[in-house]
Regions:
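Juxtamembrane membrane-water interface segments of multi-pass membrane proteins
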Residues: 27-50, 67-77, 100-111, 184-203, ...
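Membrane-interface helix-loop-helix modules in multi-pass inner-membrane proteins
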Residues: 51-125, 143, 229-237
């Protein structure tokens, strides 16, 4: 029972990160091509200024929860994914530095460079995060000792000895890029006004078409690469409500954006991300990290979980910490409600 609880607690942390940090990553991608004037750039950055660093805390908290509850998985994944983790770490550093330094430099060339770094690092982060999830769904070449190493790519095929990037994980990366860019566009349509908000709302429709197509492609590809991902759904048919939720939330984004209801459309986007991630987690359970070298080497709940006393004590502290985190999120977002000032560059 504790394994089931902690599996879904880790999933909650991942969903929280993707939903909250996802829109400011999407805003970063849009910063590359949607904004046209310096005032619009300031407004775009102001729309995420008070929340972007707090949103990233969910990533750290998720990693800490993973280490606490499933130490074997943490050790195996963080050693095997060492190369992409270092790339992600540097991208996070570059993104944060470019975002903060821009406000302290008044030289056009340097600002343009920092804008490019901010946008490019945001785009690459979304791609790597999507590819990371696809790597977990596809599986990795676990050895008998529970460890593995992945090169950046091999022959681009998701076989027994794949690389980090193959055609399947690239689809996952593109899906994440489009989904979070759309998520960011809806956020901008809420937080900004005038032509910038209109352009943000206008780009949602073409992004939605791409997202709908990539969603179908990714679901078909996942079934082709790992047919076992359907087992839990057929053993408990009521869970087919999850893919139904994906379809309903996608439809909600389209309809609510056309009705000029950006807040409700943004919430639909949140639900889309929730259902997609929940569906991926349910397709894995109780496996935490599948092995392409044989199911006997899968890292499962029973193999990776901490001791029962540790988990019971941790559950109390996790609840306390989550209450503080949720309280902080509610406070910050309630203080940050409303639109940013396009010309003042602030809220």
């Amino acid at each position: 029972m504790m394994g089931f609880i902690w599996f879904w607690l880790v999933a909650v942390m991942i969903v929280g990160y993707v939903v909250l940090d996802g829109f400011d990553l999407g805003v970063g991608v849009l910063h590359l091509f949607l904004v046209r004037t310096e005032a619009e750039r300031r407004a775009t950055l102001a729309s995420i200024g008070p929340v972007w660093d707090g949103n990233e805390v969910w990533l750290l908290a998720g990693g800490g929860t993973l280490y606490f509850a499933f130490p074997l998985l943490y050790a195996s994944a963080f050693s095997g994914f060492y190369l992409p983790l270092m790339i992600v770490l540097w991208l996070l550093i570059l993104r944060g530095v470019s975002l903060e330094l821009r406000n302290h430099i008044d030289v056009g060339v340097w600002r343009a460079l920092l804008d490019g770094v901010f946008g490019l690092s945001s785009a690459l982060l979304t791609i790597f995060f999507g590819a990371a999830l696809a790597n977990v769904l596809r599986g990795v070449p676990l050895q008998a000792d529970g460890y593995f190493f992945l090169p950046l790519w091999t022959n681009w095929q998701p076989g027994p000895h794949p690389g980090i990037l193959d055609w399947y994980t690239v689809i996952g990366g593109l899906l994440a890029l489009v989904a979070l860019t759309l998520h960011g566009a809806l956020w901008l349509s809420i937080k900004t006004s005038g032509e910038l908000a209109q352009r943000a709302r206008g780009i949602v429709n073409p992004l939605w078409l791409l997202l709908a197509a990539l969603t179908v492609v990714s679901l078909v590809a996942t079934i082709a690469v790992r047919p076992a991902s359907l087992n839990n759904y057929f053993s408990l048919p009521v869970t087919f409500v999850v893919p139904v939720g994906v379809i309903a939330s996608l439809a909600g984004i389209w309809l609510l954006n056309r009705k000029a209801q950006p807040v409700k459309a943004f919430l639909s986007s949140c639900f889309y991300l929730f259902f997609m991630l929940a569906g991926a987690c349910w397709g894995l359970y109780p496996t935490l990290l599948p092995a392409t070298t044989g199911t006997d080497r899968d890292i499962t709940l029973s193999r990776a979980i901490s001791g029962p006393h540790t988990l019971a004590v941790g559950l109390v502290w996790w609840g306390f910490g989550m209450a503080l985190a949720i309280g902080y999120v509610v406070f910050v977002y309630s203080k940050f409600r409303g639109k940013v000032d396009l010309h003042a560059g602030g809220h």
